[in-house]
Swiss-Prot record:
Organism: Xanthomonas oryzae pv. oryzae (strain PXO99A)
Protein name: Probable transcriptional regulatory protein PXO_01555
InterPro entries from the UniProt entry: Integrase-like_N, TACO1_YebC-like_2nd/3rd_dom, TACO1_YebC_N, Transcrip_reg_TACO1-like, Transcrip_reg_TACO1-like_dom3, YebC-like
The family this protein is said to belong to: Belongs to the TACO1 family.
Pfam families on file: TACO1_YebC_N (PF20772), Transcrip_reg (PF01709)
Amino acid sequence: MGRGPSIEGRKNASDAKRGKMFTKIIREISVAARAGGGDPSNNPRLRTAMDKGLSANMSKDVIERAIKKSTGELEGVEYEEVRYEGYAPGGVAVIVDCLTDNRVRTVADVRHAFSKCGGNMGTEGSVAFMFKRLGVLSFAAGIDEDTLTDAAIDAGADDVVVYPEDGAIDVLTAPDAFAQVRDALAAAGLEPAHAEIAFRADNDIVVDGDTAVQVRKLLDMLEDLDDVQDVYSNVDQAALGA
């Protein structure tokens, strides 16, 4: 009987995944600080990125260095934001948000992923109209639904979505109300497990069989690219076994 992966092998894989996640967060911190300054109290995007880093057990020293490199206190790489749109197999719409120091490399990598998995890149705006940009504050099961709903609506949230399959709750806001709602909920002792401004599809597409396999392959391949920060699609995640 063959042996499974060694403990060392699993650890190396875990370390690599953690390192890639840290790289993405550091880039987000860098771009946020460069765009809005290094003070998180006056820069909601930076605060969100810093919170993401701290939640991932990133040290404060690493976060501070990333901020200083972005504000010019230390030498660092300058990243720019680029967005690509396209279609996966089955007509699934895909948005790919990137932070890069080399657009030529990034677009080549993204185009290769689409092509390899049977999809195709589109022009700007070709699929974005199928999504809305929202603030999303996600709470794990166990939090009191009525308390959270009342606090969220009072704080200016647009909607509260409860997922009966696992009891999780999402509070949805307009992007410009995201920081206000997050701060109000935190002041009420309601801290989300995850908070971000993201794209949400207006309607999901169900795929199955080989199409589902190819869609999953494309999304995974895109997410594994170093320059890619976020990947959004309108596929029904249940159809992918997610």
